[in-house]
Amino acid sequence: MIMFLTLDDFNFEDKRVVLRVDINCPIDPNTGEILDDKRIREIKSTITELINKGAKVVILAHQSRPGKKDFTTLKNHAKVLSDVIGKEVEYIDEVIGSTAREAIINMKCGDVILLENVRFYSEEVLSDWKKWENITPKKQAETNLIKRLAPLFDYFVNDAFAAAHRAQPSLVGFSYYMPMIAGRLMEREVGVLSKVLENPEKPCVYVLGGAKADDSIRVMKNVLENGTADKVLTSGIVANIFLVAMGYDLGVNMDIIENLGLKSQIEIAKELLNKFEDKIVVPVDVALNINEERVEADLNKDEKVEHLINDIGEKTIELYSEIINEAKTIVANGPAGVFEKEAFAKGTEELLKAIANSKGFSVIGGGHLSAAAELFGIADKIDHVSTGGGATLDFLAGEKLPVIEMLKESYKKYKGQ
């Protein structure tokens, strides 16, 4: 069980709180309009609670990264956030300058400020922060960003679960100077994911698809070796890799595996099949893309697949839906096919419907599958839609997440004080 400090552990009255969130949103590159404000809505409970407890809240966040078209200011984020929490959020177009510092010093209880995109500062995007030997509060605390801001605050609340697999200064550096506390979103994410990883109600089924097959296979390896998953249902590129490992000739689909740099995953799939063949389920049929039309085709080891596989087939949908229906816990990540094309959305939509209608506890990962759930109007029927993409996958793969590790360290240091 992961232990960390929460908002219940401190008195925030008249205290300055630096709140790190992940409100990285899809943005129209031409207009700058925020296309989906889900991540902004998800942090409402933490901000509202801090306001109600009399805190002075200063928010740090990022949008995209240098070189991307959606790498922009947080001005529009402040407007949307103001609407979401029903209170004006003051936007300041700098992070550590005199204007920002003066505004922070002069805050009143209940005030909320959103500072500029922290990734405008080179310290925040150094590749070194991905290396474990550099991930220490002291090292991050030595950055200019943290040294300038930390003296202004009493507490550091981290609600940026979607960035928990990162180790930038703004995510972990403040913990060298003050308690690092989990926000309500962070608390909920870690609680739910810990439950489905460490103590799921059985039978537990993992449904893994999408194009990020290496990430999904890391998750599969962890949940099978730990006895977490009773069945793993594969689809997308993940399924293709396992089909190749089983001796199927997927023709042009093998080219895609190679082009994505995933050929090495075939050997890993073979090893997993040797150990857990009875728990790994692969498609029995697929939907081929022939001149942009959906053509159902059974899989046969004696026949080469001559066209692109864009979805699982109807027999597989029925098979997977039956297994999902019997499950007490379902964890899904990645779409079953190219759901953006209407002809090949069936697998993803039907599996999501099966998950939503199941009586089991359901969790789906962020990214493409959560977007699909929104598209098909199913998201509100899922017990937990994670805000994390890479962070969720790393967590389920049993890897250390820098933000979570620092929350644990802060608990040891400050609990009971």
From Swiss-Prot:
ATP binds at residues 340, 366-369. It is an enzyme of class 2 (transferase). It is found in: Cytoplasm. Keywords: ATP-binding, Cytoplasm, Glycolysis, Kinase, Nucleotide-binding, Transferase. Substrate binds at residues 22-24, 39, 62-65, 119, 166. Its main location: cytoplasm. GO terms for biological process: gluconeogenesis; glycolytic process. Pathway: Carbohydrate degradation; glycolysis; pyruvate from D-glyceraldehyde 3-phosphate: step 2/5. Its EC number is 2.7.2.3. One of its GO terms (molecular function) is phosphoglycerate kinase activity. Belongs to the phosphoglycerate kinase family. Homodimer. This is Phosphoglycerate kinase. The gene is pgk.
